[in-house]
Swiss-Prot record:
Gene3D superfamilies assigned to the protein according to its UniProt record, in alphabetical order: 3.30.230.10, Histidine kinase-like ATPase, C-terminal domain, MutL, C-terminal domain, dimerisation subdomain, MutL, C-terminal domain, regulatory subdomain
Gene: mutL
Gene Ontology MF annotations: ATP binding; ATP hydrolysis activity; ATP-dependent DNA damage sensor activity; mismatched DNA binding
Source taxon at top rank: Bacteria
InterPro entries: DNA_mismatch_repair_CS, DNA_mismatch_repair_MutL, DNA_mismatch_S5_2-like, HATPase_C_sf, MutL/Mlh/PMS, MutL/Mlh/Pms-like, MutL_C, MutL_C_dimsub
Organism, scientific name: Paramagnetospirillum magneticum (strain ATCC 700264 / AMB-1) (Magnetospirillum magneticum)
Lineage: Bacteria, Pseudomonadati, Pseudomonadota, Alphaproteobacteria, Rhodospirillales
Protein name: DNA mismatch repair protein MutL
SUPFAM superfamilies for the chain: ATPase domain of HSP90 chaperone/DNA topoisomerase II/histidine kinase (SSF55874), DNA mismatch repair protein MutL (SSF118116), Ribosomal protein S5 domain 2-like (SSF54211)
A single GO BP: mismatch repair
Function comment: This protein is involved in the repair of mismatches in DNA. It is required for dam-dependent methyl-directed DNA mismatch repair. May act as a 'molecular matchmaker', a protein that promotes the formation of a stable complex between two or more DNA-binding proteins in an ATP-dependent manner without itself being part of a final effector complex.
Amino acid sequence: MSIRLLPPTLVNQIAAGEVVERPASAVKELVENAIDAGASRIDVVLAEGGQSLIAVSDDGCGMSPDEMMLAVERHATSKLPDDDLVRIRFLGFRGEALPSIGSVARLTLTSRPRGADSAWSLSVEGGAKGRPVPAAHPQGTRIEVRDLFYATPARLKFLKAARTELTHAADVIERLGMAHPDIAFSLSDGGRKVLDLAAKRGEPGAALLSRIAQVVGREFEPNALALDAERDGVRLTGWAGLPTYNRATSAAQYLFVNGRPVKDRLVIGAVRGAYQDVLARDRHPVVALFLELDPDQVDVNVHPAKAEVRFRDSGLVRGLIVGAIRHALAGAGHRASSTLTGVALGALGGGGGNSPPPSFAHYPPPRPSLPLIRAGIGAQAPLGLAEQGLGLHLPPAAPVAPPEAREGPGEASVDYPLGAAKAQLHDTYIVAETADGLVIVDQHAAHERLVFERLKLGLTEGQVARQGLLLPEVVDLGDAGAARVTERAGDLARLGLVIDSFGPGAVVVREVPALLGDDDVQGLVRDLADELAEWGASTVLEERLLHICATMACHGSVRAGRRLSVPEMNALLRRMEATPLSGQCNHGRPTHVSLSLNDIEKLFGRR
């Protein structure tokens, strides 16, 4: 069979298979074109989730008849004036969208440029292009796509129900709307208004936060922490939700690079890493992150739909995201999501919350087979003894008061953020009075976080006990892998892992952190090498150490069912106020719930 050139129509249909996967893909391309045209308002109308009709109208700069003829040709664009594929300043740049859509659907363009006396219309059907004809239309452009995939009926079999396709289209518009709060967006389907995002004016930060709240929900703003960090020319701004304000999926993670919505696995992984010890494994944080960096530091031309990007220094970006979010979370102190109050009122029958109760991962009770217990650290050992057994040189915890000391009432001011302890319920929950209501604290969850943060402090200060291996482990990694690991030997040694080069393509492990016990050394080092190859950095060792610290904190903290005196309860409250991330335990469960006097009066019908 001889080699031949494919006909243009088939070439466009092949391109459409990459660019236009579903109606939402066409919506994305058309709305991005409208944004690039300088529109201040963009209206999207669908029918049957976009399968029978997609209409996008804008008030942008418009196109002349000659420009319309070029716009439906492959690789014709106005967005690369200098033929520079590196410093791209527009959302679209390939000139593929309109010809690709026109090859698989019935496409009609109607446009009127600024200053023109009339508008023109052009039709493309199954790749066949007509001629521009006069039309009536205000300044701007309207593009109609009818019968999507009629020219490639096999693609129709892969579309979902109209409602599902509408959901995908709405998500596209929401993400683009968040990146451009100064533009008004609307979405309708079958005559029903689905989205109506008014343009936001005023101070840019406030306008952006208001638009995000429009999309995510009004509860986001009071439960979000502002981010603003910069490192080596890369700037990160945005908001990160409190750990106790979370979702069942990652759908509420909004990521933007130079104003472009992306779903980049490096960024998603960095977000997950930042929340690793404050969120349950089956829960996902709510974030809106905006990365700004020099265009030549990021390649946006690596994905057919431009949904992914590639960073020149991925380790820098990952480190910036993790560091900025962790810094914001630490600054939140004991703060917990305001939605917990609504959940609590709902559970009490007050009807104060519309949100379903959050789900938190179940964690098992201590097991005697844990390496920590085998090392002689009992699940209920006093805190000071447990920490000394770890080899972390931390100050011992305050001693537990003897029973006779528990009789005094204890004095504390209700003006403290977490108030003054008044009672203990079922030897498990502390009830504290605040200036404007009360706080209920889960004593085990709260103390678990306090212990964990003390253990983490030992890790960050390099106070990690090591144990030498009787028989050093030789790990074959290949030349590249061994070079990456030995290059980071100094950083690893600070975490208790001592590694040396051992001939071509191999390393030898001489000491490991005492915390790891009899962990799989070979597997650990291979994981380190893999992460270094992919990201330029590795958190495998740190994550394993933190996991063990979390287990120890769970085992070594005050248990439910233990009676505390009022002074002990107040001491716990004061330590919570001074400890980062104390609004949730290591498993992501909230440590306390606040009820205002107004909330309590609602329960009794006083308001």
